[in-house]
Amino acid sequence: MGNLDSDGAGSVELLFKNQASLKLSITSNKAKIVDDYFEIKKRILYFDDPFVINNLSNRLYKANQVGNDHNSDNVSLLKNSIIDTSSADIRQAIVNKKLEDLKSSISTICKGNLFENEFGDYVYKEEGSDKAYFLKNLSSGLKTFVLFNTFLQSGVIESGATIIFDEPEIHLHPKWQLEFAKMIVQLQKALNLNILINTHSPYFLYALEVFVKKYGTLESTRYYFAHIEDRCPVIEDVSSDIERIYKTLFSPLQLLENVRDSL
């Protein structure tokens, strides 16, 4: 990585499961591929905002089609996921079989699906109920699971794909954080996904750590610690010493404990 105080170019090298690498040079916030690049044939998804689901209404959707950002992509994928009902081919049937346990877990929280009503608005309806809820009225936590479940049901999340979760715990109740962490681990194991998770929550991190051990994916899991050294960002593999991450994440709580003890 580069330094804002330096005129030199920054660099990033991405290694994909020890098989292929991609080197980038970054100057003035613009990235350039250094070496010959390889073709990424699987889908890459980036989740950082469950409220993107609100943009499914026709008027807002058209307004948000302009631009080339991940949220616009997610809106397009969501709309196509609702319209496309042809995912019951042989390959998808095999995937669905692998995901039976995961879908069972999701159904305890997300008990319905998205539909387009007669007015062209997208709504959420639970199975066995005639009540329809406008998406803007769903809780932020439920939005997270609805988004996740819609992509899962439609086959958007395919075997071998790459998913980036940017602080997925932010909008979730602590109990739902545990469920979501479990679902992420189950999903990775079932579909052999490449998953990158960024979190500032020791609670969510611990949940991931526990479920990784429970579902036997420890060998394919790495933990990285992002910090600053000499005014430069460093991303360090601390898989053998995860306590370094917990120590940093728990430090604000320790400050509160110190204040309380001084009262």
Put a short name on every predicted segment:
Residues 179-263:
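C-terminal lobe/lid and adjacent interdomain/linker elements of RecA-like ASCE P-loop ATPase modules
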Residues 173-174, 178:
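Conserved D-loop-proximal element of ABC-family nucleotide-binding domains
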Residues 166-168:
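Walker B catalytic acidic pair
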Residues 162-164:
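Walker B motif beta-strand of ABC-family P-loop ATPases
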